Amino acid sequence: TIYTPSNYIMPSRMQKYMDLYSNKGSSNNLSQSGREQGIRRLMSINLLKRLESSVYSFNLTLTRIKDLINQTIDMINSYKSGSKVMDMVDYSDASDFDEDDQNTDFFSVGKKVKIDLADMDYITWLHELEQDAENLELLSLMIADITPEHDIKLQTLFDLLRDKMANPINLGNKKVIIFTAFSDTADYLYANVSQFMKQNYGLDTAEITGTVDGKTTIRNLRSDLNTVLTCFSPVSKGKAMLMPNNPAEIDVLIAT
């Protein structure tokens, strides 16, 4: 319900927001309501995508939703009789969605919406927000014990890496590329895989995503895309000519 505040606008106040949305470029209130419903559906699907990606990524999004709900609950609880305008700009943060979802119309139109709590059935909304908060807290508690040591997907990846090291497709080929849709998962994988590969095989790892600077376990090595790729694929990138005095080589690349 955190993503559908328009559902709680009182019927007697609906015309006010129909006119307001019309002034912002929408033909009627249904466009804003439809956008909210779309974002809610996308977030439901997105939570499943992030859970499939990694429990770490899932938990981050879950925490952000919980924080948003709790902030809104606090705002409603502090509401008195005066005019309190609720700014809805941040209720559809696209950063938790993958690139395909971010390109939908839900994130390109009608973002700046303000709703006066005096125009809402905020008592019902508050009750449903509290129910959502309770359910999400229970879900958080259920996944809290899934540490990297108990993360079956991560441990399965370690097994695959062990097999790759023991049985390379080409003799001496230790190169591994791991792709993921979410930068949060890339961070999680880098933190765990880099340590695993360094401790067990003495191999270096790098991470490249589109949202942050790259990372690498090689000290004093620039972590920009070109440098990382040159060290990961030294023959094809001509590393001997570009970096003749640097013997560093990256064997594991984690990327989005």
Regions inferred by a protein language model and the residue ranges of each:
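Helicase motor interdomain insertion/brace
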Residues: 1-223, 243-255
